[in-house]
Amino acid sequence: MFKAVWSIGRDRFDRIEALRRAAGACPQCISDGKDAYAGHVYVCEETGEPIAAGRMYPDGDALIIDRIAVMPQYDAMPYAEFVLRMLLFKAQELPQNDIRIICDESRFALVRRFGFAQSGAHTFTCSRNAIVWDSECRH
């Protein structure tokens, strides 16, 4: 079994930072100033072993979702999709209509399945009301 935990800002951020580092995030992607006001989702085993994490933060009239990280031993499982679904679900409660996802190429297909269109080298955009929720969970 696993559990998912929401946090805001740097509350319990040390484990998210450690997960990003262990998942192979580039040094400048471990932590930045946006983490202080972002919403974070953290997924772990019941034992506390980290599995995946992601964050979401406001940027003007849009919400940004980025830093989706999955531990290498869990990457073949659909935890990246689970994290993205949780972030998108929470986005439905927020006032921003546009959602932008910033990700690396390994997540492009996943993001497209939710109806996001590429709008930059590593950026995808979709309005909150146009999200495709019936994408299949695939490994």
PLM features: what roles do these ranges have?
Residues 1-31, 40-47, 136-139:
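Short amphipathic alpha-helix that is part of the acyltransferase structural core
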Residues 42, 49-57, 62-69:
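Conserved beta-strand in the GNAT
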Residues 58-66, 75-76, 119-125:
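A conserved beta-turn-beta hairpin within the catalytic core of GNAT-like acetyltransferases
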Residues 70, 76-89, 103:
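Conserved acetyl-CoA-binding loop-helix of GNAT-fold acetyltransferases
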Residues 105-122:
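Conserved active-site alpha-helix within GNAT-family acetyltransferase domains
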Residues 122-139:
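C-terminal "cap" of GNAT-fold acetyltransferases
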